[in-house]
């Protein structure tokens, strides 16, 4: 449910774009993301760092889009965010020797170090490619095509890659699940 909730601002952006224009849609995106963050803080008493960073990028690039009445800024936001994600994954692996993917998922999944590294690199590569593809779509094709790509294309690619990542680590999951089950067993049983 939480993952669906995070897509609400994107859905609002799409619907408002289809019924008005990119500038009003950008304003709706800023407001809906701000409300989502406020709701998360109210509900959980905290907000995830990635949500704050993404909102900050939307706020900066979205405000520039609206104030300067130039959609180039909101289009660049996608590229910059994906490039930063890619860079963060690479830096975490090569400079800190602690892949972000592992830091995010190690409480849920136990994988060998080389698998964490491969997964981290795969996601870094995906984000780098998506960053580059966004530049092409945003600046070579129509605004409507870019919005459709941003909302549906990037989402579909990310979901497909998540599925592929799951298939890649699948053979390691039974051992992890077994350990979790035995760790959670009630000693009185």
Curated annotation (Swiss-Prot):
Membrane spanning stretches: 4-24, 53-73, 76-96, 121-141, 149-169
For whether the record's keyword set contains Membrane, the answer is yes
Here the disulfide bonds are none
| Localization terms from the record | Cell inner membrane
What GO cellular component entries does it have? plasma membrane
- Xref: InterPro entries: YciB
Membrane topology value: Multi-pass membrane protein
Say which domain of life the source belongs to: Bacteria
Q: Report the main location listed first in the record.
A: membrane
| Keywords associated with the record | Cell inner membrane, Cell membrane, Membrane, Transmembrane, Transmembrane helix
The record's family statement is:
Belongs to the YciB family.
Which NCBIfam families does this entry report, sorted A to Z? ispZ (TIGR00997), PRK00259.1-2 (NF001324), PRK00259.1-3 (NF001325)
HAMAP family assigned: YciB
What the protein does? Plays a role in cell envelope biogenesis, maintenance of cell envelope integrity and membrane homeostasis.
Identify this protein by name.
Answer: Inner membrane-spanning protein YciB
Give the species this sequence originates from: Psychromonas ingrahamii (strain DSM 17664 / CCUG 51855 / 37)
